Amino acid sequence: MVTRGKKYQDAIKLLDQSLAYAPAEAIDVAKKMAAAKFDETVEMHLKMGLDPKNATQQLRGVAVLPHGLGKTVRVLVFAQGEAEKAAQAAGADVYGGDELIKKVEAGFLDFDVAISTPDMMSKVGKLGKVLGRRGLMPNPKSGTVVPAEDFKQVIEEARKGRVEFKLDRSGIVHIILGKASFEGQALLENMTSVVDAIIRSKPTGAKGQYIKSAYLATTMGPGVKMDLRAVSAMGGA
């Protein structure tokens, strides 16, 4: 049996577990329960009505958070020749070709987002064991495999708060919305952007109820159940 600490026990007293909160109310409760000494991350967890094993029900996409993630984002670009110069001009923090691939392979991971030109992917693909498990592998579906002329836009989006979402093996999407120190309205607008992107990315093979449950939680806090109708109404025009 897991024993929770005093701060967790005090925090959960603020939560009515019999309720499904409206998104704005859930954010307010989650912020009040964030009692750690550090600025806790706010995450949303959506149980989807999708089968992770069904090829027609895969969910993956990108959302741009209007209020960012509350941290400095370091961007790495795999490119060579003129494209490498373009990466530098576009403001990439780290950029390069074969030597950079060797550096990453050796353990260099001081970056938050990795971008690649299409022609580099045959080499970058060999970094799957290093980048894949950390969610850093460039991927065309997430808009991180792009030609050099798109570097500036993609890098700017990454710095503003470009987040990827993907259905995990349990049929759940986990996504960061920001920090507990954010204003409630900022977190709500970030959430709206994420839900809208997820609804617009609905797989063609999806059947029945698309979002089955929605919870909000800070790093050290308990989950706050959200009203499904209210969450679903946040996105998808």
UniProtKB/Swiss-Prot annotation:
Keywords: Repressor, Ribonucleoprotein, Ribosomal protein, RNA-binding, rRNA-binding, Translation regulation, tRNA-binding. InterPro entries: Ribosom_uL1_bac-type, Ribosomal_uL1, Ribosomal_uL1-like, Ribosomal_uL1/biogenesis, Ribosomal_uL1_3-a/b-sand, Ribosomal_uL1_CS. It comes from the Bacteria. One of its GO terms (cellular component) is large ribosomal subunit. Binds directly to 23S rRNA. The L1 stalk is quite mobile in the ribosome, and is involved in E site tRNA release. Protein L1 is also a translational repressor protein, it controls the translation of the L11 operon by binding to its mRNA. The gene is rplA. This is Large ribosomal subunit protein uL1. GO terms for molecular function: rRNA binding; structural constituent of ribosome; tRNA binding. It comes from Dehalococcoides mccartyi (strain ATCC BAA-2266 / KCTC 15142 / 195) (Dehalococcoides ethenogenes (strain 195)).
